[in-house]
Amino acid sequence: MRQVAIYGKGGIGKSTTTQNLTAGLAERGNKIMVVGCDPKADSTRLLLGGLAQKSVLDTLREEGEDVELDSILKEGFGGIRCVESGGPEPGVGCAGRGIITSINMLEQLGAYTDDLDYVFYDVLGDVVCGGFAMPIREGKAQEIYIVASGEMMALYAANNISKGIQKYAKSGGVRLGGIICNSRKVANEYELLDAFAKELGSQLIHFVPRSPMVTKAEINKKTVIDFDPKSEQADEYRELARKIDENELFVIPKPMTQERLEEILVQYGLNDL
């Protein structure tokens, strides 16, 4: 069982990328569970056809400790098992804590079955606080992919996430598997992301082009592979799935200083920011 965490700054398209990627992996015959670790609880919407899934924390709040697995785990596209950890009530408690509670509960209820090929954690990555680092820290996820784009804040967040991975790689077995570019159509985006990934000692595992097809599929509450399996964009996600399935480059990243990050940004023409 490969346990994979997908990190990236808020709004970068992590959840969209994770769901489209897992749809591609399911098509390749993999058995998958997706655990949404984002308080927005939108990590599985496209796999479930827009079904607003009740999160683990909401279920716990309403039903107490006595929770059945099928009240928090729903099966979606390609047999993908979907769970949302959810978040605390606004202004109360810690969202990271919710992730810890959810993963522990899934373990107790026997969600991690032997027939699973992959477990994906879709994790908010602006703040690498203790709770959000939970999938890395507790040795749950062994491989991390960071979703980024050619925008400065996306790369700043990706560099910060790499610092978190570096910190926990020494004690656990966690490694960076690569950077996934979710294109924003920024100038020199491919070259910039490629250079950024290499500087970390990693790879740009796939460049996902920007496409209106993604939005179209989302409006229809589906992944692109489900909505229009013959589209070019569906093939992009299949290619990303293949690369992750076959990936063998797992590294302890070498995060860069703020100065070095800015040098790379300037070099690739983001100096007009």
From Swiss-Prot:
Q: How is it modified after translation?
A: The reversible ADP-ribosylation of Arg-97 inactivates the nitrogenase reductase and regulates nitrogenase activity.
User: What are the recorded GO MF terms, alphabetically?
Assistant: 4 iron, 4 sulfur cluster binding; ATP binding; metal ion binding; nitrogenase activity
Protein keywords? 4Fe-4S, ADP-ribosylation, ATP-binding, Iron, Iron-sulfur, Metal-binding, Nitrogen fixation, Nucleotide-binding, Oxidoreductase
PROSITE patterns linked to this entry: NIFH_FRXC_1 (PS00746), NIFH_FRXC_2 (PS00692), NIFH_FRXC_3 (PS51026)
Q: What class of enzyme is it?
A: oxidoreductase
Modification ADP-ribosylarginine, positions: 97
Disulfide bridge map: none
Cofactor(s) for this UniProt protein: [4Fe-4S] cluster
The record's section on InterPro entries has: NifH/chlL_CS, NifH/frxC, Nitrogenase_Fe_NifH, P-loop_NTPase
The record's catalysed reaction(s) read: N2 + 8 reduced [2Fe-2S]-[ferredoxin] + 16 ATP + 16 H2O = H2 + 8 oxidized [2Fe-2S]-[ferredoxin] + 2 NH4(+) + 16 ADP + 16 phosphate + 6 H(+)
Q: For this protein, what is the EC number?
A: 1.18.6.1
Bound how, and how many: what does the cofactor note say? Binds 1 [4Fe-4S] cluster per dimer.
Q: How does it assemble?
A: Homodimer.
Q: What does this protein do?
A: The key enzymatic reactions in nitrogen fixation are catalyzed by the nitrogenase complex, which has 2 components: the iron protein and the molybdenum-iron protein.
Q: What name has this protein been given in UniProt?
A: Nitrogenase iron protein 4
Instruction: Identify the species of origin.
Output: Clostridium pasteurianum
